[in-house]
Amino acid sequence: MRLRLLPKSTVRRLSFLLAATVAIAGLSACGSGGSSGSAGNATSGTINWWGWTPTDTATADNYIAAFNKQYPNIKVNYKLVNISDWVAALRPALASGQGPDVFDVQPGAYVTEFKSFAEDLTPMAEQALGSDWKSKVAPIGISGLTADGRLVAMSVGAVYAGMLWINEGTFQKYNLSPPTTLSEWEHVCQVLKQNNVGCFVQGAAQEGFDQDTLQSIANSVQPGLWTKASTGDAKWNDPGIVQTLAIWKQMFGDGIMQTGAVGYQQYPDANNDFLTGKYGMVMMGTWYTQYATNKAMTAALSAAGVSGAKPFPILPVAFPDVAGKGNTSEMYGDSDFGLAVATKSKNRAAAETFVKWVTTTTAGQQVIADQLDDLPALKSVEPNLNVIQLVNPSSQTKPVQDLVTSVGTVTEPRESLLSADVQTAILAAATSVATGKATPQQAADTLQQAAEAAGETFK
């Protein structure tokens, strides 16, 4: 799952505090992004990889072990850096030339922050995949990791949102079908509540997940409107955004949202309530696909405090047409993270070999795909569902396969276009409408004012 990094304002403060260190280390020498290290050997050597993800070092070790089957003479050391320490640790290390050879990059502010320390990987992509390499990679993994015409990092995989996950057993028990409209959604909730089962659970206290639901509602109202507001091509108080907030309010008033949703966190509250069977539906993205497997579902149930629970099948379903306009559910996403090669790396060739293997080879991308957390960057690679043990292959294989296939052409971003200030304003708008402290129009106007105050420009 994509982790949210520090807000841009925090990045700016840390950058200012580190300015003296950076200057002493010769930051200006690497400002152009040109190489100042040495190439070294492409098939041997030791490289250091720093990242905030994978958060489970065992997963990183699995990637490295698979890589070493083909390149046994390249030793890769993975260093997990806490997300809150990322900028403070990485920037001076890269500037001094004593930092990692390979480092994680997330779309958005961090591409801008670290682009001068990273090699342009366009030549590597062309060498690995051909001159038409862009046609072979999920587009969302290119746009978010490119700055000033340079490919700052190569996408490892992406996460997408815009759909729901349902408890298949609960829906079967009460003879229910996944809702396709707002009224059908309300009906499903009525039936489940009559049987003392929760319907839909949301951690409405967390901006990122409120944003997912709002973006999906907006796509039902007017496809692409949310992205246009994010880029300044539409305003946040556009009538379509006002209608989006009105439908959001209706979900609270008509009993789709659970009581107390505004005080809920998506993790751990909503996640645990869904996985323990208290609710039949939850708004999660493609990262939730991992829980379609026996292994991950069993581990998740244990983490949720359920002892000896039997894994149950979950299914991805389209977000309902809540606006009733006949618009199909649109997915949106970002590269979860990409791998960059440091300009000052003394083992640049070996570092590029590692990045190339992880991001552009079938073998490397298959390792990523089979984790069912990130979806691979290469369009030609999909999870091997014949090997992965799903909880109920007969019912889950096709929906999971369809989901994986459908996101390969997604171009609408999820979070990468939004500043921290706008994200904070989105949460304020969502909660003020949900609690009745503001009308949809008032909340939209306040959101627009906050975006303008944050320096966003609009046409």
Which residues does each predicted region cover?
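Extracytoplasmic "Venus flytrap"/periplasmic binding protein-like
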Residues: 66-136, 172-180, 280-281, 299-300, ...
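Extracytoplasmic/periplasmic substrate-recognition and gating elements
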Residues: 254-256, 299-373
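C-terminal capping/gating helix-and-loop segments adjacent to ligand/active sites or protein-protein/ligand interfaces
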Residues: 146, 155, 229, 392-450
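Long, aromatic- and glycine/proline-rich binding clefts that accommodate carbohydrate-like moieties
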Residues: 136, 311-319, 369-421, 425
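A structural signal for short loop-to-beta-strand junctions that line the ligand-binding cleft
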Residues: 93, 101, 130-169, 326-332, ...
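Glycine-centered hinge/linker elements that transmit conformational signals in sensory
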Residues: 191-192, 231-262, 315, 319
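Extracytoplasmic/periplasmic solute-binding protein
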Residues: 147-156, 186-237, 253
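Hinge/lid segment of periplasmic solute-binding proteins
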Residues: 108-161, 213, 309-317
